[in-house]
């Protein structure tokens, strides 16, 4: 049942959120200003790559992904609306040397849809499977919504990295009636999505044996202000074998 929750999440988006998401594909993040302590989103090395078979005969390429912040300041988003009948508007709080400011973002939001009853940001990260022989994209990750928080220590030696979680629970992502929600990722911390979670997979049922690249990218559509947009992706090259097993051939750079 869990494997089909991606469809439920799409349905939960609704026409208003989908329209906002389409507009977001063409969004350009607000320019940075001098003195901004910007986040820098990226991905830790992909882990736990494996093929799982479902009871209805599908093959799922499962993996663990960790989005990380290696910048100078927190990655903090606020979701707000005037009433429960309004869609959430997203803004990013940017910390500075003297305080903070907020800039609007075209990021989409959705409540629930993946078995977790809280608010999510749509397309915070994306995964895709690519054939290495011809570069064709043959699969995409099912997971669409993300409630991110500090749950994985990544690089606490970075200046400004807290020793304990600052954004520690998705309980602050609220219920469906909330009007104001805060999500965040501290400097030096990551948010892990384990291979066993619902929707954390690419469906490879109809793929032939061969060599592929699994690529995971943070902020694919440039919806957020960062200090560096060139280090958002990581990948793993792998060989899918005829019996449904997988062999790792190599890893791309991580943040």
Language-model region placement:
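N-terminal export and membrane-targeting signals
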Residues: 1-17
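C-terminal region of N-terminal signal peptides and the immediate post-cleavage residues
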Residues: 21-35
